[in-house]
Amino acid sequence: APTPEGMEFVIMLAFGLPKGELNRPAEKAHRESMERLCVYKQEPLRETQELIEAARLAPSSLNSQPWKFVVYRNRLHIFEVQKRQGGKRSAWQEINMGIMMAHILMAAEEYWIDVTMTHSDNLAEKPVANYRYVGSVLVKP
């Protein structure tokens, strides 16, 4: 399909079950542990934990996984790790973050979890070294 005028094709991501065997089992994907990805402020609801796991398993360019989470019972604040490659931001950062956030939303739909994605100006204005606040996910109990 042609792309809209002024836009160019950048990336494609397939969803669904494979016809044959996967080229790599999920356990060999070398994803960061929950302990490295999350700062737990409260014990999360099971639903909140399901969404974090979906985000943790999201693919990223060069397996960079440029995200961190601050976790509460029914909410999760998403931060982008500000990694620099040669002094400038990776061109793939926004795509990586978008894929991860799409994984959260797809998991919410799959598991029938009612969520709202929000943005907190207060969090966005707080400087956190090497991190940029992206948004928050609220889980409705």
PLM feature spans:
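Acidic, surface-exposed loops and disordered segments
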Residues: 1-141
